[in-house]
Swiss-Prot record:
PROSITE patterns: RIBOSOMAL_L35AE. Component of the large ribosomal subunit (LSU). Mature yeast ribosomes consist of a small (40S) and a large (60S) subunit. The 40S small subunit contains 1 molecule of ribosomal RNA (18S rRNA) and at least 33 different proteins. The large 60S subunit contains 3 rRNA molecules (25S, 5.8S and 5S rRNA) and at least 46 different proteins. One of its GO terms (molecular function) is rRNA binding. This is Large ribosomal subunit protein eL33A. There are 2 genes for eL33 in S.pombe. Belongs to the eukaryotic ribosomal protein eL33 family. The gene is rpl35b. InterPro entries: Ribosomal_eL33, Ribosomal_eL33_CS, Ribosomal_eL33_sf, Transl_B-barrel_sf. GO terms for biological process: cytoplasmic translation; ribosomal large subunit biogenesis. It comes from Schizosaccharomyces pombe (strain 972 / ATCC 24843).
């Protein structure tokens, strides 16, 4: 039987920072998760770890891959978008970039 790859994460897109008409709150990012299209489906992802993986030019501890970690905090609206808070705010160049929503910690 051939080995199949299994992902422990779901792909997501960084949409924007949370904002009002005049003020932008970069501490909270809006994230659209693939396959999540309602507020009820978004409830499953609350508390899950989320990360942005990127590459740099200078290796640190032998690796050029770096990660910014965060957690999914609450739903945003009725269309499956969630709010996420990261340890370091995501830079604006990540708008539209791919994120990973880990399927842990599990609350099932």
């Amino acid at each position: 039987m051939p080995a199949q790859g299994h992902r422990l994460y779901v792909k997501a897109k960084h949409l924007s920072f949370q904002r009002s008409k005049h003020v932008i709150h970069p501490g909270t990012s809006l994230v659209k998760i693939e396959g999540c299209d309602s507020k009820e489906e978004a409830q499953f992802y609350l508390g899950k770890r989320i990360c942005f993986v990127y590459k740099s030019n200078k290796p640190v501890r032998g690796s050029k891959i770096r990660v910014i970690w965060g957690t999914v905090s609450r739903p945003h609206g009725n269309s499956g978008v969630v709010r996420a808070r990261f340890t370091h705010n995501l830079p604006p160049k990540t708008f539209g970039a791919s994120l990973r929503v880990m399927l842990y910690p599990s609350n099932v």
